[in-house]
């Protein structure tokens, strides 16, 4: 389960940022997680609650925005939603699809005090 290492990395990053800003408490964290990122959102939520215990982020609210995956056909330029890394263009039936979004895993914002 790599979600625990992700949760711990997020906690480390946001608590370090809070420390740099002279704050001692993280009260909220907002993440963006793409559907093709390989992250199980429910597992990440579970791991987050365990990872933040006894840290400045203990009790912080976690908000996760799930980002749809979008591909662009390199043959015809069509942009369309995708559900896997291997997608076929709905317009020209080519498999030359570049993933435009959906692999994200990032901290959008933190709330500190």
Curated annotation (Swiss-Prot):
User: What does the UniProt function comment say about this protein?
Assistant: Involved in the maturation of [NiFe] hydrogenases. Required for nickel insertion into the metal center of the hydrogenase.
The UniProt entry, under PROSITE patterns, shows: HYPA
The record's similarity note reads: Belongs to the HypA/HybF family.
Alphabetically, the GO molecular function entries are: nickel cation binding; zinc ion binding
Protein name, entry field: Hydrogenase maturation factor HypA
Q: Which GO terms describe its biological process?
A: protein maturation; protein modification process
- Would the keyword tRNA-binding turn up in this protein's UniProt record? no
Key words, A-Z = Metal-binding, Nickel, Zinc
Say which species the protein is native to. Chlorobaculum parvum (strain DSM 263 / NCIMB 8327)
**Residues the entry annotates as binding Ni(2+):** 2
* Name of encoding gene: hypA
Coiled-coil residue spans: none
Q: Which sites bind Zn(2+)?
A: 73, 76, 89, 92
Which HAMAP family does this UniProt record tie to the protein?
A: HypA_HybF
